[in-house]
């Protein structure tokens, strides 16, 4: 009998193309960048030992964030720069040495996201231009040295012009807006005092309510983008360690700060009815280092740099410089 022919192996299956367009990641990158753009904590406004009653502050902040979306199918790299300006409108001292402060603030910022999808040669870019208006209120138990308890709150409204464009595609534009409100408290304890300097440690807790609304959008090709509106709660637990002079307020004050961020920003959108989310982890851990000091009698400057990391290859690098002018 004729032997059976050897079986021919099946050819290797062709790799499946990515289920996602890179534009999907650009939309999600814009969504996250807008919500993060104007978020801040009390120390970002330049608090320091023996601050004067009235002051105006300016903060320039830049950050670079790398993250995934759609369970790792999308890769996003976002760069954001913001400028925030604020001024005290009212300062009221208490009979026990404390102080209340009330001020207003405004901000402007822009971000750019580059998005790629697994198995897709093309790229997409997302851009956000943002603007904010808000107010803040602060109480210090010890206004002169800022020892003991403090409480800070702020609220702001922001609006954004967004755009997304894939390689060779028509640019898509849409608008969004957001509201945020923050409550923060902490306690500054001095220790290790020498004849001229002392150490301070300051545990901090902050809770932020975040509301983000994005208008529905139909792309030129007919794709429907919806569902980018929701609210969320975020928290930050941290501790700040610094070393400062107790005899000369003009010397430099170095500091280091460790933070644990918990909670997610609004993180999903619907693309032709299919919901896609970013992969930002629930818990993120960060470290910031910086220094503050006087540049002139009524001018204080500061600078800081830091990084946050988390699961799903999440990384965030940031740097900021600020100036406060007292009157």
Where are these regions (language model features)?
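Outer-membrane beta-barrel biogenesis signature
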Residues: 4-52
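Membrane translocator/pore-forming domains, dominated by Gram-negative outer-membrane beta-barrels
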Residues: 13-23, 50-327
